[in-house]
Amino acid sequence: MKCESKNGEIKVMNKIAIMTDSNSGITQKEAERLGIRVLPMPFFINDELFYEDITLTQEEFYQRLAEDADISTSQPSPADVMELWEELLEEYDEVIHIPMSSGLSSSCETAIMLAKEFDGRVHVVDNQRISVTQRQSVMDAIAMRDKGMSADEIVDVLMREKLEASIYITVDTLKYLKKGGRITPAAAAIGTVLNLKPVLQIQGEKLDAFAKVRGIKAAKKTMLDAMEKDIRERFAGSQVNLAAAYTCTECGSGKSKRDSRDMNWKWTSSPSA
């Protein structure tokens, strides 16, 4: 807790810790630089437990994926979550935790329930984001905290603006959508033969179908067109942060950035996800 004096008035300010999970794309190294904490998400590879960016690197993960390993995700254990909060509360007065969307994982709802045991000192924000939009929420929270806003004020802003974001996604192969049960083997086979590429959208809680086109070039154009429409119509007159996320290689996101230069867009970041 610290005090600031303005116009003779003493303002008491709580020390606020910002925390998120590794679904934000923020690495442990970057978290250290930002002065925040990132909860590593657990996953199983051939029934062996790993923690993202702790016991397995991204490069190793994609190598195992290419080897057709059996991979499944899980949520952090309540004990791990509470232990990290308790550690932070030894140094800070309050914690703002920004996990992935409750519509995509039960880990958010679990965290909300666990926070009730901390007498209002832990604030869990279900602002229904993941990846680059979740990352942006974290960056916004850091900026608001550094401006002197209270934890309640920061949470109010994040919740009020939670739906003011979109993610557009495409994939170069249908293999993993089939393997994860999101499409049937028959649909995957037909899509592969016809070179169909799905464009998906995360707008709020869940992952939904947005479009279906032929070829990865058309898929990327569809995403850029959708973003341009959002900027001109949905977010007209507002400052918009853009980010390109990628897997395995940065080449794809770099090409998307080059394709958007004619639109005079300025990209804020391009983390892997």
Q: What kind of feature is each model-predicted range?
A:
Residues 4-6, 23-25, 82-83:
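A generic local structural motif
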Residues 4-6, 88, 268:
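Enriched - but not universal
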Residues 49-117, 122:
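Class I S-adenosyl-L-methionine
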Residues 10, 23-37, 42, 94, ...:
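Mixed-charge interfacial surface used for oligomerization/domain docking
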Residues 12-18, 89-91:
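Long, low-complexity, intrinsically disordered polar/charged segments
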Residues 1-12:
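Short, Lys/Arg-enriched N-terminal segments with co-localized hydrophobic residues
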Residues 17-75:
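N-terminal glycine-rich anion-binding loop in soluble enzyme alpha/beta folds
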